[in-house]
Regions:
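Bacterial N-terminal signal peptides
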Residues: 6-16
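A short, N-terminal "cap"/entry segment at the start of jelly-roll beta-barrel domains
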Residues: 17-77
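His/acidic/aromatic-lined binding-pocket segments of jelly-roll/cupin-type domains
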Residues: 74, 81-84, 120-121, 128-129
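Short, conserved beta-strand element in jelly-roll/cupin
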Residues: 77-97, 104-114
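Acidic, glycine-rich flexible loop segments
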Residues: 109-129
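Conserved metal-binding segment of the jelly-roll/cupin
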Residues: 122-142
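A short hydrophobic beta-strand segment most commonly corresponding to one strand
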Residues: 144-157
């Protein structure tokens, strides 16, 4: 009987060690994202956006962005964007021709002054978007509104 109690006690002590999450596991609960959303809305810069990196895993990263006006169009030749809209609303302008296209710091990274043509997709909380590499895109936000989203960036395979 004493041996059984000792085995059970030892099992209860050791079990949590084996049940621990992987060191790269991340979970952002809805309440935490709402708190971060509110904080970002108070830190909007001259470009009408604020952002933070939620996690960087080397080959991919999670960003959290808040915009209260149109963003500049961008294009990533080697990076795929996946977007999870957290709050607000806006429009994704996808494709078309990037006007005043300029290379930025990274290889295959470009920004422009606007997009001509392409398609427009209304966005709202809960929407999920996959933006392929090489496709120019911009997030548009009506005056007095905002859009906040989780952005996952990873290399095109």
């Amino acid at each position: 009987m004493r041996l059984t109690i000792r085995v059970i006690a030892l099992t209860l002590l050791v079990a949590p060690v084996f049940a621990a999450d992987h060191p790269d596991f991340r979970l952002w609960k809805a309440d935490e994202l709402r708190t971060r959303d509110a904080a970002l809305s108070r830190k909007v810069g001259p470009d009408h956006s604020s952002r933070e990196t939620l996690a960087d895993f080397g080959d991919h990263r999670f960003r959290f962005l808040h915009r209260n006006a149109d963003g500049f169009p961008e294009q990533h030749d080697n990076i795929v964007d996946v977007v999870f809209v957290q709050s607000g609303e806006g429009t994704l302008q996808l494709g078309g021709v990037m006007v005043d296209k300029k290379a930025t710091g990274g290889a295959g990274e470009f920004v422009g002054s606007r997009l001509e043509g392409g398609t427009r997709h209304p966005l709202g909380a809960g929407d999920v978007i996959h933006i392929p590499a090489t496709v120019p895109h911009a997030f548009l936000v009506e005056k007095g509104k905002h859009i906040t989203y989780v952005l996952v960036k990873f290399p095109e395979q």
